[in-house]
């Protein structure tokens, strides 16, 4: 539940911010009557994403055996790559996002307004669907993913409304930095998941790298740890008895991306100063 909540909270807020920028600019330029076009594009995108996401979920949920392992491994890799790209893209473009959107809106037709809103929400929706599939394959609990995702969407919508009302008085930089780091940890878990699934797919069952890196048999950090264990497993890819290969994949991904993320943050501060 924790991973799906974080995913929909982040993605939902990004979509909400884009729509808020569009609506605010239309209001400031006395084009309030065209706001319904933005809302129409938003709701159409949500509906299309819901249908596509449901169909893909039904397809994936019906798989088993080697095919299931292959698909889950591919989904984990795809979600990890797209999630990483999304985080670094947002960091690089967040500062100029408002200006770029306003330039697109200036003198644009209703069709263009619809397209901007639709594409923005549809992109975030597809990313969300992919990430939630990755979360589902990791937790193996569709209901917890759905519940966490719905809660995240509700909270993101509420935050988006607050941002829309408050405008530029709210600084969301800290929020996006914290969620970015948490999502990179989630992506590292997906890297480990992908290696695990693909290793099982090819039948690699023996060797030094397949030996458990550690084994915890009791307590909150064990498989019998209940809600806490499920939360850590779903959000950070934690396992009570992971093979060394899985742990290695986790850190081979995590260390370089964290270094790169903090380096880009440092470079950004130096550029500003």
Per-region residue spans from a language model:
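Multi-pass alpha-helical transmembrane bundle typical of ion/small-solute transporters
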Residues: 1-123, 128-273
